[in-house]
Amino acid sequence: YGLTALLFLLFGFGLMLLMRWQLAYPEQALPVIGALFSESTMPGGVMLPEFYNQLGAMHGTIMVFLGVVPLAVGAFGNYVLPLQIGAQDMAFPKLNMLSYWCFFAGGVVMLVSFFVPGGAAQSGWTSYPPLADYATTGQTYWLIGMIFLITSSLLGSMNFIVTTIQLRVPGMSYFRMPIFVWAQLVTSFLLLLAFPPLEAAGVLQLMDRLAGTSFFLPSGLV
């Protein structure tokens, strides 16, 4: 978790530097960097607004969902929480690995979206419909990646809850648990409440894009 999250953080940091560089020199060609991108994204080395939106959407997603959260919860939390409650490991180590591979797969799918026709997601990292239904193919990849990441978070939340409830050392009541363990437990419960509707919305958006449904498309509203 830690090494993978750090790699994603470095990539997100690079996107941020590219955005700030263009903001520092508006309407000017970026030396060296501008030559590395195609004319469809940076004609003459000047960043198009659509490409800037792609960088903004992917930067926000990567830093939050692929960097900070996996580093703080997946890496630090999975290591520290069992130590603080006297457990040898998390309740479901294999579920932990499944959560990691969902996280890794989601991150890779998101990064691949930069190389598909039309580029990465442009509708913002919150991906509100109906704008998200009309974006490029990269938006589809972004949605698939988000579904993987949400699934990873749900699996991890279940693991944290069961570990905290079932594997506490004898004599440790809820009132004696460290504040960090309480924070992870409450956060896990909140994720179980908030993320299933979010994942369902992502699946419905995917169906609008790929299966011809109209859950969010204005044309399907009565």
Regions found by a protein language model. Give the residues of each.
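Membrane-embedded and interfacial regions of multi-pass energy-transducing membrane proteins
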Residues: 1-222
